[in-house]
């Protein structure tokens, strides 16, 4: 029997509105190949995504800025102009021609934006962040703590970007809530030291992310929406002392707010941004199992990413109901390794 016939990784699964033929997902990968001035995806992006599409497979796009002011990184595509929407439509058409599905990852940088690119670097709180600690040559940004008016405006950006995604032919969206970017900055005390209704207790720190989630779900339907989290990552100055004390309640809050959500996408503890430590000795509480248990009690699907190989993905899928997202293996093309997708 073939690998495809003998492993759960290649069994069909319904994720929100889409009926997938297997559980192998393209993880969002920052490519930085868009036009530097217009943030329009490059013409060859359609070929890039089509190469990674498969019949009944799910791709999650590179992070895509929801508005110009949400950016602050060069050559990253946007989804806030008609020119950008038209360019993305050629990409989604190419994926659909291969029988695949594609979700757009909606992205806002927050305090890690480059101040040379955007006039205001927005932040959840006033906790200093030194970009040089991540290997960047940029000095620490002078950022602006978001007011309630700013927060409401950004919620509107997310909502409009979700609508633009559907216009561009995407099958859904993933809200980027991981890796120390804006939504993650509200969730964690490493960056959120606010004393108003958006800071302090978990309920307050969840307020902005939930507003975004609810606005996006209202705009395009919860079965077209996923959200990403990275509970254990130290990337960009993040990580709570007790990550699960934040992210288990966060998963519960997500599912309570949107029980028909398509998926929650979590990053494994061995990953921090673009770096991984496959042989790292994990602490006892460094485990996605408690979050998986929360998600497993609902209709929401659970996607995991971080350092998987074809062999470990097959073993993981056999033990769980998870979908497994690959990044670097998709760059090298899984099909070159005889993966049956």
Label each region the model flagged:
Residues 1-341:
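Flavin-dependent oxidoreductase catalytic cores
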């Amino acid at each position: 029997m073939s690998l495809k016939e003998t492993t759960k990784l290649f069994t069909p699964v319904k994720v929100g509105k889409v009926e997938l033929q297997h559980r192998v997902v393209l993880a969002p990968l920052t490519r930085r190949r868009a036009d530097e001035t217009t943030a329009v995806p490059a013409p060859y992006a359609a070929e890039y995504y089509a190469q990674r599409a498969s019949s009944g497979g799910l791709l999650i796009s590179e992070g895509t800025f929801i508005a110009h002011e949400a950016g602050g990184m060069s050559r990253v595509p946007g989804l806030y102009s008609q020119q950008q929407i038209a360019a993305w439509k050629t990409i989604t058409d190419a994926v659909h021609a291969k029988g695949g599905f594609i979700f757009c990852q909606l992205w806002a940088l927050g305090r890690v934006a480059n101040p040379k690119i955007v006039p205001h670097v927005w932040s959840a709180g006033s906790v200093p962040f030194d970009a040089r600690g991540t290997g960047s040559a940029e000095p620490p940004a002078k950022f602006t703590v978001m007011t309630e008016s700013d927060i409401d405006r950004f919620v509107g950006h997310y909502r409009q970007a979700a609508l633009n995604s559907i216009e561009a032919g995407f099958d859904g969206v993933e809200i980027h809530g991981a890796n120390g970017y804006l939504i993650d900055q509200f969730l964690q005390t490493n960056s959120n030291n606010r004393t108003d209704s958006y800071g302090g207790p978990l309920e307050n720190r969840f307020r902005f992310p939930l507003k975004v989630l609810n606005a996006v779900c209202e705009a395009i339907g919860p079965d077209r929406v996923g959200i990403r989290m990275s509970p254990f990552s130290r990337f960009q100055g993040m990580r709570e002392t007790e990550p699960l004390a934040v992210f288990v309640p966060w998963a519960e809050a997500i599912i309570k707010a949107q029980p028909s959500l398509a998926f929650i996408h979590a990053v494994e503890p061995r990953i921090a941004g673009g770096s991984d430590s496959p042989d790292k000795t994990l602490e006892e509480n460094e485990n996605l199992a408690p979050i998986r248990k929360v998600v497993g009690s609902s209709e929401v699907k659970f996607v995991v990413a971080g350092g998987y190989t074809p062999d470990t993905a097959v073993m993981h899928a056999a033990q769980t109901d998870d979908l497994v997202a690959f990044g670097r293996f998709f760059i090298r093309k899984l099909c070159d390794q005889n993966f049956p997708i």
